[in-house]
């Protein structure tokens, strides 16, 4: 899914025009910052997105002050939209000095209030230099850019390099801050969400405990064999966004090749054939 994220820096944006003129799927809106700031455009934008049934999220820019107070301020503003949009903790700037123990306090307090585990947004370099081992049950949204050149229109497979360990993957990638779309005269953050609308709505509804991924089933294996989810890290991210354990899916595919020969060649669109092969695999 093609996503943009916006703040008051894009106050002049006409969401209706941008959606009408581009293959845009959804928007993440800045809601709050610190313990008192609220984006003056937040209510207008989110109300429009909600009314028009567009996928959306909302983020809190962490200032690194009182973690509980920041979570409470965020919740007080986004409360009407809980379970409708994805909540995000924007971990950058001054908050980085406080570290992930502080971040966990914010995340835990917001979850107490809302019942939803927020997504974590940060740069890939932060994931690689700080200890996120206690936070891997939160969905991850990374920022990593190939360069700072203008990007005209969305990219299907944005460049990404480097591990996100200890996370098993990420569900969204901000790949430029210099994106350009028809209907808006300015730079935009472009993001790729590795999932469909159902996966997005699942994250809104609190179904974002990534420790509860489903094992492989015939339908998801068939879709994977048909290359619906891409390859390598993109595939893992997409499967996780669909709610499936990518390791279970890959293990099943490996066993299918071992038992069934050239499964990808033979399987075609025949789900009954795949079911029969899976029955053999499970019987071993």
Q: Residue ranges of each PLM-predicted region?
A:
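Sec/Tat-exported extracytoplasmic proteins
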Residues: 31, 50, 78-81, 110, ...
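Catalytic domains of cell-wall/extracellular-matrix polysaccharide-remodeling enzymes
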Residues: 85-160
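Repeat-associated, polar segments at repeat-unit boundaries in modular proteins
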Residues: 240-263
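Extracellular/secreted glycoprotein ectodomains characterized by long, lumenal stretches
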Residues: 220-225, 265, 269
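Extracytoplasmic Gram-positive cell-surface binding/anchoring modules and repeats
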Residues: 218, 225-236, 244-246
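Functionally critical loop-and-helix segments that line ligand-binding/catalytic clefts
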Residues: 1-10, 17, 21, 135-136, ...
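Short, low-complexity, charged amphipathic interaction modules
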Residues: 263-284
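Substrate-binding cleft of extracellular glycoside hydrolase catalytic domains
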Residues: 1-116
């Amino acid at each position: 899914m093609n996503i943009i994220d916006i703040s008051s820096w894009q106050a002049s944006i006409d969401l209706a025009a941008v959606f009408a003129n581009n293959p845009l799927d959804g928007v993440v809106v800045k809601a709050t910052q610190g313990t008192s700031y609220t984006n003056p455009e937040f209510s207008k934008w989110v109300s429009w997105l909600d009314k028009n049934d567009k996928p959306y999220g909302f983020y809190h820019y962490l200032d690194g002050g009182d973690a509980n107070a920041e979570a409470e301020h965020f919740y007080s503003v986004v409360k009407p939209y809980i379970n409708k949009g994805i909540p995000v903790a924007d971990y950058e700037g001054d908050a980085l000095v406080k570290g992930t123990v502080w971040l966990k306090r914010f995340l835990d307090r917001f979850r107490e209030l809302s019942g939803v585990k927020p997504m974590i947004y940060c740069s890939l370099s932060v994931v690689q230099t700080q200890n996120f081992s206690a936070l891997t049950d939160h969905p991850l949204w990374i920022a990593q850019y190939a360069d700072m050149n203008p990007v005209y229109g969305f990219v299907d497979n944005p460049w990404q390099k480097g591990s996100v360990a200890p996370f098993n993957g990420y569900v969204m990638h901000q790949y430029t801050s210099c994106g350009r779309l028809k209907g808006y005269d300015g730079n935009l953050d472009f993001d790729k969400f590795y999932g469909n609308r159902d996966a997005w709505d699942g994250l809104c509804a609190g179904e974002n405990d990534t420790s509860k991924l489903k094992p492989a089933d015939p339908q998801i294996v068939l879709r994977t064999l048909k290359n619906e989810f891409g390859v390598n890290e993109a595939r893992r991210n997409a499967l996780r966004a669909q709610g499936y354990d990518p390791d279970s899916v890959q293990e099943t595919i490996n066993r299918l090749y071992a038992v069934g020969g050239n499964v990808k060649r033979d399987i075609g669109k025949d789900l009954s054939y795949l079911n029969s092969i899976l029955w053999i695999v499970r019987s071993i």
